[in-house]
Amino acid sequence: MTRANARELAVHLIYGREFTGEEPEQIVATRLNKEYYGLLAEENEVYSDRPSKAQMQYIDCVVSGVANRTEELNEQIQKFSIGWDVARISKLTRTIMQLAIFEILYVADVPTGVAISEAVRLAKMYDGDDTGSFVNGILGSFARSLPAEV
């Protein structure tokens, strides 16, 4: 499994929390156990390979991190989504941007450009090309606002 696939799994889990309210540790343990994961593999190719130990650590880190910093991440999205109320942005698109901003700020081994590119890719895949452009604009503005060392 690639980091891109692990990122996509993380988006699924973070998005799922929007509806279940499960704690991050609970949703990761439940959705990534062998039995449940096997059922998902029949429906979605991204579940065809199991995450490695390093990928599981990444998934745990970002799912918990986004859950614990949702308000902060949404404030950043709101700040750079000129003319849009963050509540009007689809939950999935918001989830993708939350993950990207979390990665940029808190995951040292993910370069800013990669976080943005992957967010745009996921937004296009799940919400269409226009959404990819929207996400790129918000995340690009966010990235330009950061000090050079971030």
Provide a role label for each language-model segment:
Residues M1-G132, N136-V150:
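N-terminal interaction/assembly modules
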